[in-house]
């Protein structure tokens, strides 16, 4: 029996593009260092990477993902692969099929999901870079592979559509298990602070027999509510489904300063959580309190978290995703790539590890 470690994760999917264009990172003393090394020195133990089918800019496709995944494995970090099943961002507002799949029938789409998922994982396996965990879809609250797998909006929120959506997800899960049955499956939605919507989603998946290992939630306070709402939701979902839960996307600003030519996604004081200013101290407090909430989930079912793009520094003007960097104040590095003191929150999280290990942790044991 192997106890699963508490995940202190980072999604660094932009790292490849930043490095290729000359961006770099430094430790607290200004010494240049490889990003993965810096993250590991900062107590991160897991990396999440997104994969797009055929992205315009070429980053986050299979070839580039293999190169980065090999580095993740060489650093001895836990690896979560996030399938978007799209050529671009898949999120609650966009779940568009890859261009190559646009004309497929529903049955062909199921086969495409299955074949593509298995091909990606087999390729990673050949390079000794197999993920430990896989997300079948990204923030799939509204379904995925629209419109075949769409469940958002009255017209699509029907039993029949949920069955079609679940059918696509099941083919993805089967493909993962066919390559390596040990890989854990995460199902990820965006409703960190919304218990009613979270229940609705996971109740549907339970009723439809979707078999997965871990609940993944995004939680951005300016979209998803208070930390109390997050805590209440995590507690309820743990008791209701008995599955480990990971807050698989979150972030908080270290500044509201906006360099010329940038417009941050979060740039208004009134969107901040009371008591958590947009400062390195505020960001640190946010992370400490968030990690405490995840650790306190009943039954030891709080499995950890991932910070979304802590290293997406504004190192250049044009990005392969077709829009400017809108995240540069939500990172854990300053605008020039120097590591912030907020990594200390992860260390504080680790110091609780001993008492954590003594808690009943059956659900996290393989």
UniProtKB/Swiss-Prot annotation:
Pfam families per the record? Glyco_hydro_53 (PF07745)
Q: Which UniProt keywords apply?
A: Glycosidase, Hydrolase
Active site, UniProt feature: 139, 249
Q: Domain of life, per the record?
A: Bacteria
Recorded GO MF terms: glucosidase activity
Q: Does the keyword Hydrolase apply?
A: yes
The family database entries (InterPro entries) matched by this protein are listed as: Glyco_hydro_53, Glycoside_hydrolase_SF
SUPFAM superfamilies attached here? (Trans)glycosidases
What biological processes does GO assign it? pectin catabolic process
Family membership noted in the UniProt record: Belongs to the glycosyl hydrolase 53 family.
Q: What is this protein called?
A: Uncharacterized protein in bgaB 5'region
């Amino acid at each position: 029996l192997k106890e699963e470690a508490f995940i202190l994760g980072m999604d660094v999917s932009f790292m490849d593009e930043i490095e290729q264009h000359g961006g770099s990172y430094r430790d607290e003393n200004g010494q240049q260092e490889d990003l993965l090394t810096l993250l590991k020195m900062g107590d991160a133990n897991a990396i999440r990477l997104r994969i797009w089918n055929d992205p315009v800019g070429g980053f986050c496709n299979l070839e580039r993902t293999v190169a980065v995944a090999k580095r993740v494995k060489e650093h001895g970090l836990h690896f979560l692969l996030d399938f978007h099943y799209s050529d671009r961002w898949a999120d609650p507002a966009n779940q568009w099929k890859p261009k190559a799949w646009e004309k497929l029938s529903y049955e062909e789409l199921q086969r495409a999901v299955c074949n593509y998922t298995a091909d990606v994982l087999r390729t990673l396996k050949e390079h000794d870079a197999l993920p430990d965990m896989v997300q079948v879809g990204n923030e799939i609250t509204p379904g995925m592979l629209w419109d075949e797998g769409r469940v958002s909006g009255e017209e699509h929120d029907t039993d029949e559509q949920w069955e079609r959506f679940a059918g696509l997800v099941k083919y993805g899960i089967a493909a993962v298990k066919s390559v390596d049955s040990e890989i854990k499956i995460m199902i990820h939605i965006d409703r960190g602070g919304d218990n009613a919507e979270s229940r609705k989603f996971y109740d549907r998946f339970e009723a439809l027999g979707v078999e997965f290992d871990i609940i993944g939630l995004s939680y951005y306070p300016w979209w998803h509510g208070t930390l109390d709402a997050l805590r209440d939701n995590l507690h309820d979902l743990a008791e209701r489904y008995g599955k480990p839960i990971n807050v698989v996307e979150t972030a908080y600003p270290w500044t509201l300063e906006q360099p010329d030519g940038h417009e941050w996604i979060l740039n208004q004081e009134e969107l901040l959580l009371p008591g958590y200013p947009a400062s390195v101290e505020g960001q640190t407090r946010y992370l400490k309190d968030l990690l405490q909430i995840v650790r306190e989930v009943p039954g030891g079912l709080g499995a950890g978290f991932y910070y979304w793009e802590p290293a997406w520094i504004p190192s250049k003007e044009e990005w392969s995703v077709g829009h400017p960097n809108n995240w540069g104040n939500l990172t854990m590095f300053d605008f020039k790539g120097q590591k912030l003191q907020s990594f200390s929150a992860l260390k504080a999280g680790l110091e609780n590890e001993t008492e954590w290990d003594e808690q009943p942790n059956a659900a996290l044991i393989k």
